[in-house]
Amino acid sequence: MFIQLKNITKTYGEGEGAFRALKGVSLEIAKGDFVALMGPSGSGKSTMANILGCLDSATSGEYLFENVSVQALNRNERALLRRHFIGFIFQGFNLLPRTTALENVELPLLYRGIARAERQKIALESLKMVGLDGWENHTSNKLSGGQQQRVAIARAIASKPLFLLADEPTGNLDTKRSVEIMKILQWLNKDLGITILMVTHESEMAAFASKEVHFLDGNIDKTKGRKGDILGDSSDLCADSSDSTAQGGKI
């Protein structure tokens, strides 16, 4: 299995003021899946995405990425995993405003120590993939919102990630631009085989994904989602679960 989460919990704070954002979540994601992670604000979906992207750590439980225990990695090792295998797309684009599209896409490759000529070649190829061939010398602050998100996608795929995390990728876009972005993500998944997890609250955008997982109050809500998307419970993946409220899913 590509990704396995076993009885994952996340608690912020201590004592009476502690808040449990995740309450024993178990989930499997197969290689090549395109999963929409849905739920209301405060349901735990963003916390779950941060853990999957190695941007945060679980309080307890086990996270296996390609059979590697992420919980057992130190901070530097998690950073290496994130840098080499995971791509990120954010709602706010997170581009350098006065930097060209090409330079923005090159940035993660620069951090990986790739030579300039090779960086530019990969960045140009990535921009072409998202329909921005010929736009490489435009600064990002001169681009439309849809174009900026395309640059962000090109940057995310430039390092050829195994796993792409998209956090509300259409949140700042109108319907037309949102559909364009979703078609690109769908193409990356179906044609390039990139496994994608997308956080969204929009059911219209979730329809582009192949599977849905709904969160509610720190657990997977098994009463929602498409038939066959959520199977089993936490005992399927973690027999020693001690949290009676734990929910689980299998994609």
Language model region names:
Residues 2-215:
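ABC family nucleotide-binding domain
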Residues 212-225:
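H-loop (His-switch) and adjacent beta-strand-loop-beta switch element
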